């Protein structure tokens, strides 16, 4: 029984949300939504798609977090993009290409928690490998291929057990930093069935890692698209997300032993 007990104890230390004695706090992990071969939601006029936008601006989020003294890693589950502008932006941000794209919404079991299966699991598993302090999936939202007439409700989705405070912090930052589009924004905790496509949220919960999915702006709402196409405003959005993460980090310090 002793070897089994030791394995359980080690698992709790490594994956239970704390930092093992003598270990440095892990990084903030950002994940670029989708990949070059499946770019995610796009605006009806083709001006914005999720993958291209976050290729360009994930580095801005990372830079703000690192400037505050925290380590940060940017992941993308696919291969390096062929587009030169996207590739240069990814290189500048130091994006770690995981080379395991979600082809046809294929689902993978977690290597750490195989009972949890989902698309994008490779990114969650990498965050667990890195002992991430928290994880932010950078996305843009959409309700379909037609323009919305009314302002949609922005969402900050989070894993149910651990993500609420991080989500509330990002939500508060949005209301302050991008008030013109954030008054109706809300936090949506989710518990996903183990076989569902977003089961990676449960794997991160099991690993003790707070996680949020940024889905606050919509690519099929014209005012949002106009905002996202403005470089200065897009950078403001990236800095605002970083501000929300930093506020949470300051409330949850991890001291090095």
Task: Map each language-model feature to its residues.
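Solvent-exposed, polar/charged alpha-helical surfaces in well-ordered, non-transmembrane soluble domains
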Residues: 51-59, 63, 67, 117, ...
């Amino acid at each position: 029984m002793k070897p089994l007990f030791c394995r359980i104890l080690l698992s709790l230390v490594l994956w239970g949300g704390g930092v093992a004695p003598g270990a440095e706090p892990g990084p903030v992990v950002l994940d670029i939504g989708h990949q070059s071969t499946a770019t995610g939601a796009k605006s009806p006029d083709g001006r914005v798609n999720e993958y291209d936008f976050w290729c360009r601006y994930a580095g801005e989020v990372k830079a703000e977090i690192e400037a505050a003294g925290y380590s940060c890693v940017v992941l993308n589950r696919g291969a390096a993009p062929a587009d030169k502008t996207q590739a240069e932006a990814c290189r500048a941000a130091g994006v770690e290409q995981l080379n395991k794209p979600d082809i046809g919404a294929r689902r993978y079991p977690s290597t750490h928690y195989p009972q949890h299966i989902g698309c994008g699991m490779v990114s969650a598993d990498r965050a667990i490998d890195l002992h991430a302090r928290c994880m932010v999936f950078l996305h843009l939202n959409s309700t379909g291929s037609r323009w919305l007439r009314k302002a949609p409700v922005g969402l900050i989705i989070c894993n149910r057990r651990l993500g609420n405070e991080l989500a509330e912090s990002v939500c508060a930052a949005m209301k302050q930093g991008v008030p013109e589009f954030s008054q109706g924004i809300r936090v949506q905790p989710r518990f996903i069935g183990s076989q569902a496509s977003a089961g990676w949220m449960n794997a991160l919960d099991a690993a003790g890692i707070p996680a949020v999915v940024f889905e606050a702006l919509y690519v099929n709402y014209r005012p949002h698209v106009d905002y996202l196409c403005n470089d200065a405003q897009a950078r403001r959005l990236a800095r605002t997300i970083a501000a929300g993460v930093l506020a949470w980090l300051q409330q949850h310090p991890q001291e090095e032993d």
